A protein has these predicted regions:
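A conserved donor-nucleotide-binding helix/loop in the catalytic core
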Residues: 1
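Catalytic-site signature of metal-activated, phosphate-bearing donor transferases
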Residues: 4, 9-170
Length: 170
């Protein structure tokens, strides 16, 4: 089994491990796992879930699928069933946190100038408008509505901050 996720998609390790131990994921060729989505700050959590993380059976993966331009969507869409989307943890809540748009203004400008959708909209103007005022409760990417939550993880914009946890497994 292979887990496909981006660096800004962070698992709740304990809950994901519990789910792996008690779920029937091996009976599916591919799963899209539900995730929370955040914007601007790690405390701004969308009311709507996404499912960008993919868990796929290694035996079903082929190089054409892995190298497809649609990346994880292709992995899920092109593999045969059985498959499931919006898979949540044992408690019914997402096990992953997606921080794709949790960035400073400068980082967000850098992102929109470089990403594959840069010509879809006038992203630079949207970023400037977004940061001209406090967060308004909706994002300019999807138009999701948000709620304020206590961040699950500390995210520092000023510097890289490593906090040792547990025993090193080296």
């Amino acid at each position: 089994t292979v887990l496909f996720l981006d660096a800004d998609e962070v698992p709740d390790g304990r809950r994901f491990t519990e789910w792996l131990d008690c779920s029937d994921y091996r009976h599916n060729t591919a799963l899209k796992l539900a995730n929370y989505w955040y914007f601007r700050e790690p405390s701004n959590q969308a009311l709507r879930f996404e499912d960008t993380v993919v868990l796929a059976q290694k035996r079903a993966l082929e190089s054409e699928i892995l190298l497809h331009q649609d990346e994880r969507d292709a992995i899920y869409n092109l593999l045969p069933g059985p498959k499931r989307r919006h898979v949540a943890g044992s408690d019914g809540n997402p096990m992953f946190h997606h921080y794709s748009w949790v960035r400073t203004k400068e980082e967000m400008l850098q992102k929109v100038r470089a990403w594959g959708h840069k010509d879809d909209r006038d992203w630079v103007t949207l970023v400037h408008e977004e940061f001209a005022a406090p967060f308004r409760g909706t994002d300019f990417v999807h138009g999701y509505s948000y709620r304020a939550v206590k961040p699950c993880f500390e995210i520092h914009f000023d510097e890289i901050h490593f906090e040792p946890k547990g025993t090193p497994q080296v």
